[in-house]
Curated annotation (Swiss-Prot):
Localisation: Cytoplasm
Domain CN hydrolase residue range list: 90-360
Organism: Arabidopsis thaliana
EC number(s) reported in the record: 3.5.1.6
CDD domains reported for this sequence: ML_beta-AS
Enzyme class: hydrolase
Catalytic activity: 3-(carbamoylamino)propanoate + H2O + 2 H(+) = beta-alanine + NH4(+) + CO2; 3-(carbamoylamino)-2-methylpropanoate + H2O + 2 H(+) = (R)-3-amino-2-methylpropanoate + NH4(+) + CO2
Protein name as annotated: Beta-ureidopropionase
Induction comment from the UniProt entry of this chain: Up-regulated by nitrogen limitation.
Reported phenotype of the disruption mutant: No visible phenotype, but unable to grow on uracil as sole nitrogen source.
Originating gene: PYD3
Entry GO MF terms: beta-ureidopropionase activity
Length: 408
């Protein structure tokens, strides 16, 4: 089923799993409590030997969720108590959302509609005391890059453009760092477009930006029609609340991309995305969780929701009939921790805000426990990669000398 946007911009409750918001809700409703508890242990892991604790949120945040009909969930990751360090607890939020108006509406109305839709969700994060908030990939617009039509470039804006100004006021109001992934137009370099995350500080200042490292060329995701691979490396942004990084969408499929943010000292890595069910849903709960484990940091995974229908049909280069939509963006935003625990996912079809308290001491504790940094062989990997990028590279393959001998 798909979550459709009607001509008046209203959304229907399609896109569920057999009528349930998420896999976790389906299992909870249909398994005996003792069975669900065991399944939950295997699906979500254990944080410091126990299930994640629920956070009691202010009534004002709950009221905003009820009034504006968005999913609101909150859970807490703890760490072991240490003698030499105090807990370093930070409250982090993720927002997933559908577009506000049909893609046929005037572009300025579409953007303003999304601003208006997100304002109460950001307010809920603010009154709930969120310190760092991340929005979804290209949150100011429909994910129109499947169409290959140039007119969607009009949604691009400078780093200090309209969306940043909108969020700067909220960042100051709530003393909140906000990660804002946008379609950037680089005014100083020939007005080239980039897929960019703008990091807005809790004082309303622009801390910096990161441009998407890996650009997909898979099915409808032919984004290189609009922008190419980023040029910002793997920056980690030191904020008053902790060290954060942004691995934008398709970068989650590249383990070395995750590794690089970890080597630069990230404690939380956000993965703002736009991905659809048929293509990637079985991979979604695995990749970020694996990255959190392998790199000893927290990961926040965000995916938009809904089915965005475009005016003109397009093809995918796979011989299948032309169509007017990507498919269903399945939401399911969640957090993963370095100890292999993770939160239940947000709804598969509703707008949502996921809040988590994280004790960042857990990052070092799991570096010490597993010793992945200590036991890694970076010099060996570096030597192989240095050889691999040369034209005369020869794979290190040892063949059986009898491999091609005729059998008797």
């Amino acid at each position: 089923m798909d979550h459709m946007i009607s001509e008046n911009g209203e959304t229907s409750a399609e896109g569920s799993i057999c009528g349930y918001d998420s896999l976790h809700q389906l299992l909870s409703a249909n398994l005996k409590p003792e069975l669900y508890q065991e399944v939950n242990r295997l699906l979500l892991g254990r944080n410091c030997g126990r299930s994640l604790e629920q956070i009691v949120l202010p009534e004002s945040a709950k009221a905003l969720s009820s009034k504006h009909d968005f999913d609101l969930q909150a859970a807490s990751f703890s760490a072991d108590k240490e003698q030499m360090r105090n807990p370093r607890v930070v409250r982090v939020g993720l927002i997933q959302n559908s577009i506000a108006l049909p893609t046929t509406a005037p572009f300025s109305d579409q953007t303003r509609g999304i601003f208006d839709k997100l304002k109460p969700i950001i307010d809920a994060a603010g009154v709930a005391g969120v310190n760092i908030l991340c929005l979804q990939e290209a949150w100011t617009m429909p994910f129109a890059f499947c169409t290959r039509e140039r007119r969607w470039c009009e949604f691009a804006e400078p780093v200090d453009g309209e969306s940043t100004k909108f969020l700067q006021e909220l960042a100051k109001k709530y003393n909140m760092v906000i990660v804002s992934p946008i379609l950037e137009r680089d005014i100083d370099h020939g007005e080239v477009l980039w897929n960019t995350a703008v990091i807005i500080g809790n004082n309303g200042n622009i801390i910096g930006k990161h441009r998407k490292n890996h650009i997909p060329r898979v099915g409808d995701f032919n984004e290189s029609t609009y922008y190419m691979e980023g040029d910002t490396g793997h920056p980690v942004f030191e904020t008053v609340f902790g060290k954060i990084a942004v691995n934008i969408c398709y970068g989650r499929h590249h383990p070395l991309n995750w590794l690089a943010f970890g080597l630069n000292g990230a404690e939380i890595v956000f993965n703002p995305s736009a991905t659809v069910g048929e293509l990637s849903e079985p991979m979604w709960p695995i990749e970020a969780r694996n990255a959190a484990i392998a790199n000893s940091y927290f990961v926040g995974s965000i995916n938009r929701v809904g089915t965005e229908v475009f005016p003109n049909p397009f093809t995918s280069g796979d011989g299948k009939p032309q169509h007017n939509d990507f498919g269903h963006f399945y939401g399911s935003s969640h957090f993963s921790a370095p100890d292999a625990s993770c939160t239940p996912s947000l709804s598969r079809y509703k707008d949502g805000l996921l809040i988590s308290d994280m004790d960042l001491n857990l990052c070092r504790q799991y570096k010490d426990k597993w010793g992945f940094r200590m036991t890694a062989r970076y010099e060996v990997y570096a030597d192989l990669l240095a050889k691999y990028i040369k034209p005369d590279f020869k794979p290190q393959v040892v063949s059986d000398p009898l491999l091609h001998k005729n059998s008797t």
